[in-house]
From Swiss-Prot:
Signal sequence range: none
Gene encoding the protein: MIA40
TM stretches of this protein: 48-65
The protein's name: Mitochondrial intermembrane space import and assembly protein 40
Co-factor: note: Cu(2+) or Zn(2+).
Cofactor: Cu(2+); Zn(2+)
Top-level taxonomy: Eukaryota, Fungi, Dikarya, Ascomycota, Pezizomycotina
Organism: Gibberella zeae (strain ATCC MYA-4620 / CBS 123657 / FGSC 9075 / NRRL 31084 / PH-1) (Wheat head blight fungus)
Subcellular location field: Mitochondrion inner membrane
Single GO MF annotation: protein-disulfide reductase activity
Transit peptide, from-to: 1-29
């Protein structure tokens, strides 16, 4: 009973509401745009957030990613610094190549005669530079450890002879020398080795013959090694400077005792100023005018010097008083000290050493 009454009472109310809503919402077609309504701030934020989210998803999602390239470039081979060639490895490889080439050439061109004469040739060509080059090629010297194999046949057995210790000292000094040119600080040791060779000419005859056939002794002219005092001119009055002569003789004796070499030394050559000047025709007349007694006192140690030279030729320019007047100027005595003579032995050794280096370079170029 109560339900029926409620339904009957609610029906007119529901009908009125439906009619009011239909009247309030006007009808429109699907193609027509809805009426513009003001949008709220929250709705704008939601729309912006959705737009940013869509863009982010498009950029990061693998669904929209481009397809991978089918053909890819292979990655470069990975290697460490240990695999790279070093300077030592390159030098060692070159030495092995040189050693292999030398062994091939030696095996192809070797004959029984060359095998017999090989030790003699090595002994004759036993210059420090050549021995060092050959020792480096045949493995006698190891630059990494600094060891020298004295039993190497490239040394010609010189390390085992009676002068073996002298040879080892000189050769090792030359190998480790840092001077330029190389070996300049080892001249004394090589001189000692040569002196030892001279004591055994039957064993080291080839070495001595090679040294004798080397470069000739250089001509130093008036500056040849001499143990005697320098010859000087005489006084015009013919008197000797006795005090100067005694002092010069004493100095010459000291100089001979201190500068005399061990065995081999070039003989002293005394050259007087009067003898050298005799070759000049312009001075011959002046020399002939002097008495013989003045010429005999040429080794007094004093030198006569003029303040102004006397012109010999005819006047060239009349404006200069030297060409107009020939005036004899009084000579005065000047004491000349003893000049130290050159050491010809050391000079010869240096020249021979340089020639040996050049010969070693030529041999190395030929072998290459």
């Amino acid at each position: 009973m109560y339900r029926n009454t409620m339904r009957s009472a609610s029906r007119p109310v529901i009908a009125s509401l439906r009619s009011s809503t239909i009247r309030a919402a006007p009808r429109r077609f699907a193609s027509t745009a809805p009426a513009d309504k003001p949008r709220s701030f929250k709705g704008s934020l939601v729309r912006l957030g959705l737009a940013f989210g869509a863009v982010y998803y498009y950029n990061t999602s693998p669904i929209f990613a481009d397809e991978a390239i089918s053909k890819t470039v292979p990655a470069p081979a990975a290697f460490s610094d240990d695999d790279l060639p070093t300077v030592d490895s390159i030098v060692e490889e070159k030495r092995k190549q040189i050693k292999a080439k030398s062994e091939e050439t030696a095996a192809s061109s070797k004959t029984p005669e060359s095998q017999q004469s090989n030790p003699q040739t090595a002994a004759a060509d036993g210059s420090p530079a050549a021995l060092e080059e050959e020792a480096g090629q045949q493995g006698a010297f190891n630059p990494e450890t600094g060891e020298i194999n004295w039993d190497c046949p490239c040394l010609g057995g010189m390390a085992d002879g009676p002068c073996g210790e002298e040879f080892k000292t000189a050769f090792s000094c030359f190998v480790f020398s840092q001077e330029e040119p190389k070996g300049m600080d080892c001249i004394d040791k090589f001189q000692g080795m040569q002196e030892c060779f001279k004591k055994y000419p039957d064993i080291y005859g080839a070495e001595l013959a090679d040294d004798e056939d080397g470069a000739p002794t250089p001509d130093f002219g008036d500056e040849q090694p001499s143990g005697e005092p320098t010859t000087a001119e005489v006084k015009s009055n013919g008197e000797l400077a006795r005090e100067t002569k005694d002092k010069t003789a004493a100095d010459a004796t000291k100089f001979d005792d201190s500068q005399k070499p061990a065995e081999s030394k070039t003989p002293a050559k005394t050259t007087s100023t009067s003898t050298d000047s005799a070759q000049k025709p312009a001075v011959d007349a002046h020399r002939d005018a002097e008495p013989k007694s003045d010429a005999e006192t040429a080794s007094s140690g004093s030198r006569m010097v003029q303040d102004v030279a006397i012109p010999i030729e005819k006047p060239v320019n009349d404006k200069y008083w030297q060409d107009m007047h020939k005036s004899e100027v009084q000579k005065k005595e000047v004491t000349v000290g003893i000049t130290q003579a050159h050491d010809a032995t050391a000079a010869n050794e240096e020249i021979k050493h340089i020639e040996r280096q050049e010969a070693a370079k030529k041999n190395a170029e030929k072998k290459q």
